[in-house]
């Protein structure tokens, strides 16, 4: 959704779609684990884009544990008029680190319990402090002003997303954001990964 250099795994999603499409086109009948192994060689976010849904991801993105669907919610995604280089964001993280350390155990427990507030309370992005995404705090005020449960930077940035309990609030935040930023989207969590649509 977020576009190039937005931190939304756009390149990984494209690669996953190509793998799934080729698997179907050529009748290769590769299993999901085989596709994920191929995808991990292409990019860290490709296995998740293949599997989709709600997962706990570890390693370099190659170790996935399927979880129950995240509680019902809506997202407003705001992409500023600049992007962030993923390699540069990780290099900065390797140099300066981060004081943000999301509580993955608490988040998994909250997902299993279906508790959106607890899911959001345990969420965080360790790359946010060092990504160089200069407008993050300003962008995050918009979803929060419209009742977002939380607002965070996507992946390595630069897009920011707000999590909402209902569509109306997400759309109100999006309408306000469109007055300032060029790309704004409203979305819901997807329950699956890359797939062939016939």
Where do the PLM segments sit?
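Short pre-catalytic strand/loop immediately N-terminal to key active-site residues, enriched for Gly-Thr
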Residues: 1-7, 149-151, 184
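Glycine-rich beta-strand-to-loop/alpha-helix junction loops that act as flexible
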Residues: 3, 10, 154-158
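DPxDG-like acidic metal-binding loop motif
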Residues: 8-34, 48-52
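Phosphate-handling active-site elements
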Residues: 21-38, 166-179
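Conserved, helical-rich catalytic subdomain that frames metal- and/or nucleotide-binding sites
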Residues: 57-150, 165-171, 175-178, 182, ...
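Short hydrophobic/aromatic beta-strand micro-patches
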Residues: 161-163
């Amino acid at each position: 959704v977020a576009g190039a250099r937005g931190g939304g795994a756009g390149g990984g999603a494209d690669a996953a779609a190509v793998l799934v499409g080729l698997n179907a086109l050529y009748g290769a009948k590769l299993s999901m684990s085989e596709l994920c192994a191929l995808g991990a060689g292409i990019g860290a976010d490709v296995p998740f884009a293949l599997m989709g849904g709600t997962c706990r991801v570890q390693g370099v993105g190659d170790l996935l544990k399927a979880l129950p669907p995240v509680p019902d919610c809506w997202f407003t995604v705001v992409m500023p008029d600049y992007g962030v280089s993923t390699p540069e964001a990780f290099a900065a993280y390797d140099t300066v680190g981060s004081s943000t350390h999301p509580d993955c155990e608490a988040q998994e427990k909250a997902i299993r319990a279906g508790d959106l507030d607890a899911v959001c309370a345990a969420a965080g992005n360790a790359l946010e402090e060092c990504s160089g995404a200069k407008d993050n705090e300003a962008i995050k005020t918009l979803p929060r002003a419209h009742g977002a449960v939380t607002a965070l930077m996507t992946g390595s940035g630069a897009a920011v997303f707000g999590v909402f309990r209902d569509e109306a609030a997400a759309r109100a935040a999006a309408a306000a954001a469109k007055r300032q930023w060029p790309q704004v989207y409203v979305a819901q969590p997807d329950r699956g990964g890359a797939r062939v649509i016939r």
